[in-house]
């Protein structure tokens, strides 16, 4: 069971950027700039999406989840599958997840969502107040 907290959706930012591209104020080469590392992560760790690429309109986008957090140590900054995220959410107290949509055809990529996962705050709803003895 995943408990997403502090969810941030970047849909408005995405929409504004695409409006700039469609109006010709931003170049396609400026927004289709996925690195080879991101494209490989999409191939091996990505989850297929039902949304078609807004730039090339040739294939469905792939969602890649990147994890960051002090507690993750060597795993920080790596792409993870949804199954791995579920397992990590039960093992670690708190870490951030950034979901990026990627088109493997034209290299379009954009941050879609970010949220926090982990065991912090799961279970008993203990008061944050502590006595002086603690």
Predicted regions and their residues:
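Short, non-ligating residues that shape and space the ligands of small metal-coordination modules
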Residues: 59-63, 109-115
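Interaction interfaces in information-processing and related assembly proteins
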Residues: 1-15, 42-52, 59-64
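Short recognition patches in nucleic-acid-associated and regulatory proteins
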Residues: 50-51, 57-93
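Short, flexible, mixed-charge glycine/proline-rich loop motifs
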Residues: 36-50, 91-97
């Amino acid at each position: 069971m995943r408990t997403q907290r502090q969810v941030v959706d970047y849909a408005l930012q995405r929409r504004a950027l695409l409006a700039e591209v469609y109006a010709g104020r931003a170049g396609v080469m400026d927004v289709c700039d996925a690195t080879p590392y991101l494209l490989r992560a999409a191939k091996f760790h990505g989850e297929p999406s039902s949304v078609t690429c807004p730039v090339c309109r040739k294939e469905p986008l792939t969602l890649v989840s990147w994890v960051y957090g002090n507690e993750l140590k060597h795993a920080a900054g790596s792409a993870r599958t949804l199954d791995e995220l579920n397992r990590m959410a039960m093992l670690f107290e708190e870490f951030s997840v950034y979901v990026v949509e990627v088109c493997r055809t034209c290299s379009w990529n954009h941050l879609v969502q970010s949220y926090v996962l982990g065991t912090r705050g799961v279970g008993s709803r203990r008061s944050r107040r502590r006595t002086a003895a603690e």
